[in-house]
Curated annotation (Swiss-Prot):
Residues 103-258 form the NIDO domain. The gene is Sned1. PROSITE patterns: ASX_HYDROXYL, EGF_1, EGF_2, EGF_3, EGF_CA, FN3, NIDO, SUSHI. Residues 696-753 form the Sushi domain. Residues 1-24 form the signal peptide. CDD domains: CCP, EGF_CA, FN3. Disulfide bonds join 272-284, 278-297, 299-308, 315-326, 320-335, 337-346, 353-364, 358-373, 375-384, 391-402, 396-411, 413-422, 433-444, 438-453, 455-464, 472-480, 474-488, 490-499, 545-556, 550-565, 567-576, 584-595, 589-604, 606-615, 623-634, 628-643, 645-654, 661-672, 666-681, 683-692, 698-739, 724-751, 757-768, 762-777, 779-788, 795-806, 800-815, 817-826, 833-844, 838-853, 855-864, 871-882, 876-891, 893-902, 1310-1321, 1315-1330, 1332-1341. It comes from Mus musculus (Mouse). This is Sushi, nidogen and EGF-like domain-containing protein 1. Phosphorylated on serine and threonine residues. N-glycosylated.
Length: 1403
């Protein structure tokens, strides 16, 4: 009893709409903060305006799609994709991408009153409030945390047609998201009007009535939407009293999913579940006001009322225009339009095209009160019914036959022609290369006027007959790389300057065994074994890591005077001596949790259904009830569950079935339309079937009576051609049928029997009888013949007398009497001269019924009617030449005249000029003759052009509509005479021409080839180039230009074509210059010389100046101190390179100090002769530039303290005191430097290059190069890998073997003939040496040397250690590795002066 009473009370409360006692509307204090003081932006005060596109910092999900921008529209909505300025709300759903969030879609006019504010917010206070609201209204998302909020507020806005005193509304839209879920909150403070006063809205002066405001959401696809109850009805005035979250005037929705989800409060009794009060598909929403259970219905489009029980009268807004009658339907209406109008709302006036059917794709176009068909290409006629014959213009060239198609044509070409108009191809002409003109293996290439021979190496000339002398000295198959110097590229298996040495067995490939597995290294003709670091190491530079200071497996990293330890996991401290405790060793994580240490703490990663610091708290399994339908897979998600739906299904529990179009059932590009439980496919042209799976097949085209048929297929676009039998003709102009996309052939033609009587062949009243391909004439009485052309001949009786001729007539005759006789039978004679029969002044003499004409000179004939000489009267005048022919004449007009009698003047074109000149073409233009009459006389222009030597004369005809022409296929650099004539074409092919407009011009010559820099010094740059004998035949001169620094001046020089190189002198050192070359043709100004396009510019830097006044201020037994002048002001140097050279090796050091003015060379040997060189280095954007080296020659003091001398590049010596030398380190020798041993050896070499980044390229003898990355002092042997291709010039470093000669001090003595060619013998500690005269080198000065330029590699040294075995002890050998810089150097070519066995050597 009590239960029934409770439900009765609930029902009464629900149906009674009771909200008394509940505070209506949301107070402004409860709105999300807004206004300019909060940082809001205000939309312009504009009717139907808005904010414009506002980019979003966070993508906002809406109806399953993410949006990166939105529009705040004044009319109460936020829209995506496009701005919506429509003021009268259209009933949802609507399409055309109108994605809208509508708090109050109505005709707002903020010009009269109110403002519209908006802003994007991410401040913590706003995010915290949004998070709390969503968790309250959607309790199923307790972990939601807002990351972005957008607030739009319409504050005290009025309606269109209102005033500043009209009612105003205040409402707000709040968008909230965390990047995945998105929500909307609507706040309504006061709603006093619902409608604008525009005619389409129908509101009154108080803003009520008509089509009221609409609130809700629209996806923009025409299907998905949601309306707040009362939308577009008068109930919208009470929207601030309704709610779905227990707060009157507030609504909350989740809008990220495919459908809108309504918020709730979860603490009231559900009226919707018990009563289900909403009808006609309306959605019931619990108001859930505490203590006052109620509901509202969200109605489908077309229904309204508290319970959606009222059908909306769509005719109430009078949608039918122009007097149309509205008929109401369910969620629809229809308009019956008056005469002259059409359309869903009678909005369109009828067009004359409505009843006009244009065929073959023609488009109807209304003109005034009539309709005209605009036809597709290929059709004509009033309704585009006639196919245009595109073959009528004979487009096929060179004998091709034309086939007419619809809107097109096809040419069937005759071999060997091809192309759309058979325009491509030519009849085969014998190749000039058939006679094999090229000798000595040359390759023949066809040219425009003959042939060109491409000669092999060693031959030249037109036919490759001339042999090129070869100065290459490379041996064993080596190839010369330099033009004027010997630089050889050796084949595999050979090496040496001239490839004269063959790679033989080396010490390291003779099965040499090294202790402890170390690898073998070539060493001074013998070998050394590289050792491991676990053996006793003795070297002169101890490392901070030698004491193994790092414990517990730590790795020691040595620095210059310190070290650091890299500790393994679990240890720390300077020497890795401290152990870290393992926090996870006690197993703190329970229930299968995983422990992870993080600094001095640990963290447990718990398995599913467990939580807590140690995974000690269990949670229930939310998937145990099997909530996912339709095969969905349940997985746990943020403490709850989520369904992973199979393809096509959606919804929280996979309860929403997929669209029939989900799996794209339509084939071949068909478009699928969703029909609810079924689908429909709209197929592409040419396909059919329920799923567009079948290709349209028109089938076999039917036969046409009295016609033969051919067709090329049965699919869309196929063509069938019909040809009528003799005696029949086509009923239509087209004989082609086309297979149409509908699967049917177009209408067939008919072969209608030809009515041969249609031409009325029967004469004289005869009747025609039609036959098949023939006819027969039934003649009237008195006529006969095939066409009744013959009558009975009354003239057979010869009724005419006195020579009269009889003419037969139907049933009669007539006599044609000779002159002098008249009468029916010509029986009466008359005066023959009475009619003055004699012409051209002839005299008539009567002769008894006849007459005789006595003709004047120049005329003859019975009546003097014939001119004996048609040119007698000079009909052509002085403007042409008369030509008599068959009694008539024709005029051949002189230049400048035309017309039958040469009476019209033919004027030439004017203002002939050259527009553009290229290598193979010239563009010219001109102006037509002055005067309209002169332009109408001519038919076109003749452009004649020929080379100045008279060869290759050509003439092109140009239509009179054009005033320019492009001359093509011209020879480069050649002068051409060009003439343009006005032309009038005549039927006898004797065209009339005007006087010519002429000019002389010359084409551009070909640009230069092989432009390169050959030498650079501090004040000079040398360049060279090449001219091809044939391609540059027209080049007369070469212009070389150099642009000075800072573009201050340009110097140009012209040289003859026989010159192929040039040197610019007097240049500034260390500056950048730009060099360009062009070719010139023509001997002088009168010959119109032309210039080629410039070659690519070369940017070249001159070398810096070498150090000036290089002097050795002090020389001891083991060192030498050098000084030089400070560089001139304005010169910025980067570094210096110091080279120390003996007769055995060269050592280099790179000093990165451009301000250096002195340097001390140490570690020299007592009593030795040295060459010291200092090179200045300047940095540019193209790399480093090196000056010429400044040289200094010294002799160190012996150990006994005696004085030695030094030379400054000459023979002026100074005496200096030396000091004792320190203990000597193993020395490095640079094998391929300027002072290599005089006799090359075949011992294998160990060489390496360093590029400054720790990458080392190493080479062992003839083996390929290898690369490896090393530290400054490797402590273990480094494996070689990563093969790199080396440059052509390889540098070799040899480690000399320590022997007793290095430690014993046995002075050498000089014999009488120790030094040759004037060299001076110098005794030494170990052996004597020779001080050679300039131009000689070698141990005994036996080599005569000269310098030639060559590409080279500069080296900057760096000392590194390398562990090797010496007996049973592992030492560190210190060697130098080098930074590499490519440069232009000088190579020495040396020739032995011995007469017994001459040989060359290149340094």
């Amino acid at each position: 009893m009590r239960l029934g009473a409770a439900w009765a009370l609930l029902l009464a409360a629900a149906l009674g709409l009771g909200t008394r006692g509940v505070r209506a509307a949301v107070a402004l204090a409860d709105f999300y903060p807004f206004g300019t003081k909060r940082g809001d932006t205000v939309t312009p005060k504009q009717d139907d305006g808005g904010s414009g596109l506002q980019p979003l910092s966070v993508p906002f999900p809406f109806f399953g799609a993410e949006h990166s921008g939105l529009y705040v529209n004044n009319n109460g909505i936020i829209s995506f994709l496009k701005e919506v300025s429509q003021f009268t709300p259209v009933a949802f759903p609507i399409a055309k991408d109108r994605c809208v969030v509508a708090a109050f879609w109505a005709d707002v006019d903020n010009r009269r009153a109110g403002d519209v504010y908006y802003r994007e917010a991410t401040d913590p206070a706003m995010l915290n409030r949004a998070t709390e609201d969503i968790r309250r209204y959607f309790p199923e998302l307790p972990d939601f945390s807002a990351t972005w909020v957008f607030v739009a507020t319409w504050y005290r806005v009025t309606f269109f047609g209102g005033s500043s005193s009209s009612p105003v509304n205040t409402f707000q839209t709040v968008l909230i998201t965390d990047g995945r879920f998105s929500f909307t909150i609507f706040n309504y403070e006061s709603i006093l009007w619902t409608t604008g006063t525009h005619a389409s809205s129908g509101g009154d002066t108080d803003g009520l009535g008509g089509i009221a405001a609409q609130a809700g959401f629209n996806a923009g696809d025409g299907h998905r939407y949601f309306n707040i109850p009362g939308s577009r009805t008068a109930d919208m005035a009470e929207v601030e009293t309704t709610t779905n979250v227990g707060v009157p005037g507030r609504w909350a929705f989740r809008i990220d999913d495919a459908q809108v989800r309504v918020g709730g409060c979860g603490h009231t009794t559900s009226v919707c579940l018990v009563l289900r009060p909403c009808l006609n598909g309306g959605k019931c929403i619990d108001d859930c006001v505490t203590g006052n259970p109620s509901y509202t219905c969200s109605c489908l489009a077309g229904f309204t009322g508290r319970r959606c029980h009222l059908d909306v009268n769509e005719c109430a807004s009078h949608p039918c225009q122009n007097g149309g009658t509205c008929t109401h339907g369910v969620n629809s209406f229809s308009c019956q339009c008056p005469a002259g109008f059409k359309g869903p709302t009678c909005e369109s006036a009828q067009s004359p095209c409505d009843n006009k059917v244009c065929q073959n794709g023609g488009q109807c176009q209304a003109e005034s009160s009539s309709a005209v068909c605009v036809c597709q290409a290929g059709y004509t006629g009033a309704t585009c019914e006639t196919d245009v014959d595109e073959c009528s213009s004979d487009p096929c060239q060179n004998g091709g036959s034309c086939v007419d198609l619809v809107g097109n044509y096809s040419c069937i070409c005759v071999e060997p022609f091809e192309g759309p108009q058979c325009e491509t191809g030519s009849y085969l002409v014998p190749s000039p290369c058939l006679s094999n003109p090229c000798q000595n293996g040359g390759t023949c290439v066809d040219a425009d006027e003959g042939y060109v021979c491409e000669c092999p190496e060693g031959f030249m000339g037109l036919d490759c007959r001339e042999r090129i002398l070869n100065d290459c000295d490379c041996r064993n198959g080596g190839r010369c790389l330099g033009a004027n110097t010997t630089l050889c590229q050796c084949p595999p298996g050979f090496f040496g300057l001239l490839c004269e040495f063959e790679v033989t067995a080396t010490p390291c490939n003779m099965n040499t065994q090294c202790p402890d597995g170390g690898y073998c290294m070539e060493y001074g003709g013998s070998y050394l074994c590289v050792c491991h670091t676990d053996h006793n190491i003795s070297h002169s530079l101890p490392s901070p890591c030698d004491s193994d200071p790092c414990f517990n497996g730590g790795s020691c990293d040595a620095h210059e005077d310190s070290y650091t330890c890299e500790c393994p996991r679990g240890f720390h401290g300077r020497h890795c001596e401290k152990a870290r405790p393992h926090l996870c060793s006690s197993g703190p994580c329970r229930n299968g949790g995983t422990c992870k240490e993080m600094g001095d703490e640990y963290r447990c990663t718990c398995p599913y259904r467990f939580t807590g610091r140690h995974c000690e708290i269990g949670k229930p399994d939310s998937c145990a009830s099997g909530p996912c339908h339709n095969g969905g897979t349940c997985f746990h998600y943020i403490g709850k569950y989520k369904c992973d739906c199979p393809p096509g299904f959606s919804g929280r529990h996979c309860e929403i079935a997929p669209s029939p179009c989900f799996r794209s059932p339509c084939m071949n590009g068909g478009t699928c339309e969703d029909l609810g439980t079924d689908f429909s496919c709209y197929c592409q042209p040419g396909y059919t079937g329920h799923r567009c799976q079948a290709e349209v097949d028109c089938g076999h085209p039917e036969e046409v009576e009295h016609a033969t048929m051919r067709f090329n297929g049965t699919h869309v676009g196929s063509v069938a051609l019909y040809t009528c039998e003799p005696g029949f003709s086509l009923s239509a102009l087209s004989h082609i049928r086309v297979c149409q996309p509908q699967g049917v052939w177009s209408q067939p033609p008919q072969c209608i029997e030809v009515d041969e009587c249609r031409s009325q062949p029967c004469l004289h009243g005869g009747s025609c009888q039609d036959l098949i391909a023939d006819y027969q004439c039934l003649c009237s009485p008195g006529y006969e013949g095939v066409h009744c052309e013959l009558e009975t001949d009354e003239c057979q009786a010869q009724p005419c007398r006195n020579g009269g001729s009889c003419r037969d007539l139907p049933r009669a005759f007539i006599c044609q009497c000779p002159e002098g006789f008249v009468g029916i039978h010509c029986e009466t004679e008359v005066d023959a001269c009475a009619s003055s029969p004699c012409q051209h002044g002839g005299r008539c003499e009567d002769g008894g019924g006849a007459y005789l004409c006595v003709c004047p000179e120049g005329f003859f004939g019975y009546n003097c009617e014939t001119v004996s000489d048609p040119c007698f009267s000079s009909p052509c005048g002085s403007r042409g030449y008369c030509l008599a022919s068959n009694g008539s004449h024709s005029c051949t007009c002189k230049v400048g005249y035309t017309g039958k009698d040469c009476t019209k003047e033919l004027l030439p074109p004017t203002a002939l000029r050259v527009e553009r000149v290229e290598e193979s073409g010239v563009s010219i233009s001109w102006s037509p003759p002055e005067g309209t009459t002169a332009r109408q006389v001519l038919d076109g222009y003749a452009v004649t052009y020929a080379s100045s030597d008279g060869s290759s004369r050509r003439t092109d005809f140009v239509d009179r509509s054009r005033s320019s022409h492009q001359l093509r296929a011209l020879a480069a650099g050649r002068a051409y005479n060009i003439s343009v004539f006005s032309v009038k074409r005549n039927t006898n092919n004797k065209n009339d021409i005007s006087r010519p407009a002429a000019l002389l011009t010359r084409t551009r010559p070909r640009p230069i080839e092989d432009f390169e820099v050959t030498n650079i010094s501090a004040n000079a740059i040398s360049v060279q180039w090449a001219l091809h004998r044939i391609q540059h035949a027209t080049v007369s001169r070469v212009r070389v230009s150099i642009l000075y620094p800072e573009a201050s001046a340009v110097q140009s020089t012209e040289v003859d074509r026989s010159v192929d190189r040039l040197t610019f002198g007097d240049l500034l050192p260390g500056r950048r210059y730009t060099v360009r070359l062009t070719t010139l043709s023509g001997p002088g100004g009168a010959e119109y010389p032309t210039e080629s396009l410039a070659s690519a510019p070369l940017n070249v830097w001159t070398r810096p100046l070498p150090p000036a006044n290089l002097t050795a201020s002090r020389v001891t037994a083991t060192s030498a101190h050098m000084i030089w002048d400070t560089p001139a002001p304005g010169i910025s140097l980067e570094a210096y390179v110091i080279n120390v050279t003996t007769s055995q090796s060269t050592k280099s050091r790179y000093i990165p100090n451009g301000k250096l003015v002195s340097y001390t060379v140490r570690d020299l040997m007592p009593g030795r002769r040295y060459q010291l060189s200092v090179t200045a280095v300047q940095s540019t954007e193209q790399g480093q530039l090196h000056s010429e080296p400044a040289h200094l020659y010294i002799i160190t003091s012996p150990r006994d303290g005696t004085d030695r001398r030094w030379h400054h590049g000459g023979h002026h010596s100074r005496m200096l005191r030396n000091r004792p030398a320190p203990v000597r380190l193993p020395e490095l020798r640079l094998l391929n430097d300027h002072s290599a041993p005089e006799t090359p050896t075949q011992s294998s070499r160990f060489s390496e290059l360093v590029d400054g980044r720790g990458r080392v390229s190493a080479r062992f003898g003839g083996l390929p190069s290898r690369a490896v990355t090393v530290r400054s002092q490797p402590t273990t042997p480094v494996p070689l890998k990563n093969t790199e291709a080396p440059e052509q010039v390889h540098l070799a470093l040899q480690l000399p073997k320590n022997s007793s000669k290095d430690t014993e001090s046995t002075p050498g003595s000089c014999s009488e003939d120790a030094c040759q060619n004037g060299g001076t013998c110098v005794p030494g500690a170990d052996a004597h040496s020779c001080d050679c005269r300039p131009g000689f080198k070698g141990r005994h000065c036996e080599l005569a040397c000269e310098k030639v330029p060559r590409p080279c590699t500069r080296l900057f040294s760096e000392t590194k250690s390398f562990p090797v075995w010496e007996g049973d002890i592992c030492h560190h050998v210190y060697k130098k590795v080098y930074k590499v810089h490519q440069d232009v150097c000088f190579k020495e070519r040396c020739q032995s002066t011995s007469l017994r066995k001459p040989k060359q050597e290149t340094k």
